[in-house]
Amino acid sequence: LDQRGIADRFLSQGQVAQVAGFAWIPLDISDFPTRHNYGLALRQNHIERILAEWVADLGVPIHRGRAVTGFTQDDAGVGVELSDGASLPAEYLVGCDGGRSLVRKAAGIEFPGWDPTTSHLIAEVELAEEPEWGLRRDAHGIHSLSRPEAGGAVRVLVTEPHPGRSGEPTLRDLGEALVATYGTDYGVHSPTWISRFTDMARQAASYRRGRVLLAGDAAHVHYPAGGQGLNVGVQDAVNLGWKLAQVVGRTSPESLLDTYHAERHPVAARVLRTTMAQVALLRTDDRTDALREFTSELLGMDEPRRRLAAEMSGLGVHYDLGEGHPLLGRRVPDLDLVTANAPLRVFTLLHDARPVLLNLGEPGGFDITPWADRVQLIDAKYVGTLELPAIGAIPAPTAVLIRPDGYVAWVGDRTQVGLADALTTWFGPPTAA
């Protein structure tokens, strides 16, 4: 969000908090070498509203109240069928329509994984009786009753006694789960919303089928631990967006889209494994309690904590772009630079989603004229230690090629070997003189 210049919109409405954790074991990230070494507590509906406002600022239309009912595709494009009988022509279709994705099913993309072993209800409601506030762990699972805002609705989290129910949850379902756990439903009434989630873990076998791609929950579902689902979905979009724009804009070949699956599928596969591990640690028998205590001791040590916290926060993502400098395939740090004109932050250079060749060596040492219509060339100096959240201090390079998603596509260490190939691979062939 900071890379696009909109982080302040979220910071002004959220609450800085220590929200990183593994199976509810806190993971402190305050010593991470990043500008935002903390979590931000902000409800999802607020996040959606802020993003919708930004989309409106960019002049992108959102067609609400119209559902996709099907599509056809051929070599020329996609025809999207809508619930009002209309159809939309498009070059590509990206299914971001959740775990029950119609787009994924219609594309014939398999969704293998693991069935649920536990089921939870979460809701905002009113209670007629004073409840047992706070967190509760018992043989059924983990439950909590809280009032996040003074005078506001009660937030309920309760484990259902029998997993496997499907469909939209009802007030009756919630009442039955409360009775099973607390012996009473506390006179629950007036729900603002009720939602069900499970520990089902599934991932699309492929993120692309022809001109159809998947992102977010349509591509992967898992237990909602540590906010990873939202983070991974946003990172899917950030990875895919600029690639799709270049292909549609005819600056890159269609094969660039294949790198989306190659990069993002392993990331989500790892998230599925870590969330399954967390569910196992949240079980409430004595043996699991012993394992949880042992895990908590391990995560109290700096090295295991830093490694897992980087993974849980998304700051440790590393795309396999080959061997080389430790920065290759990792997110570029938001360095404070000195340029001929003024001080500058690296993330400021990414606000308009254009790639950047950042030259930290002698000014004028690079000529990228054949890509100048697509890639910014910035001569700058950086004084200080270069550190990454996942791996610590690393050698400072003389130049880095930064993709629009903030990940490093090439690193120069007093050499330009491989730069032209990287420019062509990621940003299309050179423009003829």
Report residues per predicted region.
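Core Rossmann-like FAD-binding/catalytic domain of the broad FAD-dependent monooxygenase superfamily
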Residues: 1-303, 378
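Helical substrate-recognition/capping region of FAD-dependent monooxygenase/halogenase enzymes
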Residues: 24-29, 34, 49-58, 73, ...
